[in-house]
Curated annotation (Swiss-Prot):
Keywords: Allergen, Flavonoid biosynthesis, Pathogenesis-related protein, Plant defense. GO terms for cellular component: cytoplasm; nucleus. Highly expressed in roots. Expressed in open flowers. Expressed at low levels in leaves, flower buds and fruits. One of its GO terms (biological process) is defense response. Fruits silencing FRAA3 exhibit loss of pigmentation in mature fruits due to the lack of anthocyanin biosynthesis. Monomer. Interacts with AP. Belongs to the BetVI family. The gene is FRAA1E.1. It comes from the Eukaryota. The keyword Oxidoreductase does not apply. This is Major strawberry allergen Fra a 1-E. The lineage of its organism: Eukaryota, Viridiplantae, Streptophyta, Embryophyta, Tracheophyta. GO terms for molecular function: abscisic acid binding; flavonoid binding; protein phosphatase inhibitor activity; signaling receptor activity. Involved in the control of flavonoid biosynthesis in fruits, probably by binding directly to natural flavonoids. Binds the natural flavonoid quercetin-3-O-glucuronide with affinities in the low micromolar range. It comes from Fragaria ananassa.
Amino acid sequence: MGVYTYENEFTSDIPAPKLFKAFVLDADNLIPKIAPQAVKCAEILEGDGGPGTIKKITFGEGSHYGYVKHKIHSIDKVNHTYSYSLIEGDALSENIEKIDYETKLVSAPHGGTIIKTTSKYHTKGDVEIKEEHVKAGKEKAAHLFKLIEGYLKDHPSEYN
């Protein structure tokens, strides 16, 4: 089994606490509302929403995938960190066992946020991850993030 790690960093004008509430704490409600073509719904299968929780995300008609299951490892509301694993679903290829994700939102000096993400692809055997697979995932995540950011700018009184 191999582990391939990819890091990404980008910025937002939205303050970290507000962005964390929308992007992490209320994503299961917000994303289907603003991007139903991407995510149809999210449901908790086990747990209370905290560490150990297993969620099923059902994708919308605009997606190439049907569903995925996430297992939440940690949610830190004070330090604005979140980690989970993608453990099941058709977004995992036959060569990938799971993908671990870590997200940290850091308050930027200008009042916005620096978003730092780490993705760890756990492969089966000696399979290598193709760069275009990772790039496609990053582009989809960036697009979804921009939708959330746009929603927060259009609705400044929400998630305070």
